[in-house]
Amino acid sequence: MESVSKESYLPSFHQFPLCASLSEFESASSKETQSSALKNISPHPYDILQAPNSRALISALKTLQNKICRLESEKTHARDRLTNLSRAAGEHKKVLESEKRSAEWAAQEATSQKNDVAMQLNNAEQRCSLLEKQLDYMRKMMENADIQNNPIHQIPAQKEQKDMLEMQSKLQKLEVLENECLRLKATHKSSENKIQFLEEKLSVEEQERKALQDKAAQVQTSLEVNRILLSSASSQNSTQRKVKKKKQSKQKNAISKEPSSKEPLSKEPPSKCFFPKAGELPFVAGKSTTSSHSLSANVQNMLHMMKHQSPRVSQKDPKTVEHKPSILPGGSRSIPTRLMSSSTGDTLSDILLALQDELGQMSFEHQELLKHIDETKNTDMREDLERELDYLVKQMEIKSDQIIKLKRHQLNVAKLKKTAKKQPRPPSTTKPAEDEQNIGATDPCTPRNKGNLANGTGTPNSKASLELLKSVRKIQMTLKKDDIMWEK
């Protein structure tokens, strides 16, 4: 029992609160009054020592007494703290009030000082205005007094001096105007010289462009001629094959009917369908032979020359047909390709050189314009020169693009030439029967092949010629556009 009572009473008295609130102090004070009242009352006669847990009760009572003493001491200490805090708060309030009063007083003093300064400034301004008026009045009075004191002969001298000063100012203005007129005349002359120089350059460029257009037209005419030759060669091959097939069928019929009669093939009369006549050339746009800058007229002129001067198309020499009947199918394909390769290479190189010359002239003009811009001081002239320079730079960029395209096209043409040289050519034989068999085996006469040969897409050289035609047309269009922009 003693151990149980110790565990129940003692642990609750070891840990007590360090700080207590006012309500706890009030409850403690009420308890003290109650305990003091209980002390006056006589307790019941009870013997604690006779109780079974007397030791525990005695120890608990002792701890209670100690705790009560501690609480009373803490209460007094807390009361002292509260009084000190209230005093400190009052002092702090007094200090704050004194600071507020001092700040208000300082603000009032500052406003009063500002008002005083403003009043003083207004008074000073008024005095200054009055003094200025007085000074003006005194000046007028002095001038009037001088005029009255001076004699009469001094007045015209003063007028003469004034007139002289006015004349000098006018003469100076006239000199300035004359200098400006001279400067404007010089600028006008320089602008006229520049305009003449630019007109000369324009005429030179127009001539060069016309020459380039003529060269491009010649290239196109040569390409058209090559295409026409290819189509005519394909039509000749097809007609020759048909004629040879008919001959073979006729010979077979003749051999079956008359075995004794044996005529050599070489003594047969030459076929009239081997070479087309001048009117059978694939030419539709008319037959005028006058020279002009248009492409159709140039093509007509070339075809007229071919019809009247070419030994291949003319039917005056039938020996050429009789002696070499087997070389023409292979040779008719090789000749236009050689012509086309030589003509295209020369024209491309000429066009490239002309474009490079134009680019060099443009670069020289660019340098001259930069020098003029550095030398000129007039803003309007400088703006005009800067505009010309911008336009020149754009033209140079266009020319450089054209040169790059032409160089690429030259490389493509060179590659196509190499591939065409590497391709094996058909061997030329003398026997007509073998030629017929080879032609029948390799080149069957179908409508698709005829169409390809007529269009000029059967060989890589014809493709190259078509590409060159497109590039030349593009160059012509760009040159025409450049002419229009330059005239603007």
From Swiss-Prot:
Residues 71-226, 377-403 form a coiled coil. Belongs to the translokin family. Interacts with clip1, mis12, ndc80 and zwint. Interacts with gamma-tubulin. Residues 232-272, 311-342, 416-464 are annotated as: Disordered. Residues 241-250 have a biased composition (Basic residues). GO terms for cellular component: centrosome; cytoplasm; kinetochore; spindle microtubule. GO terms for molecular function: gamma-tubulin binding; identical protein binding; microtubule binding. The keyword Glycosyltransferase does not apply. Pfam families: Cep57_CLD, Cep57_MT_bd. Its main location: cytoplasm. Keywords: Centromere, Chromosome, Coiled coil, Cytoplasm, Cytoskeleton, Kinetochore, Microtubule. This is Centrosomal protein cep57l1. GO terms for biological process: attachment of spindle microtubules to kinetochore.
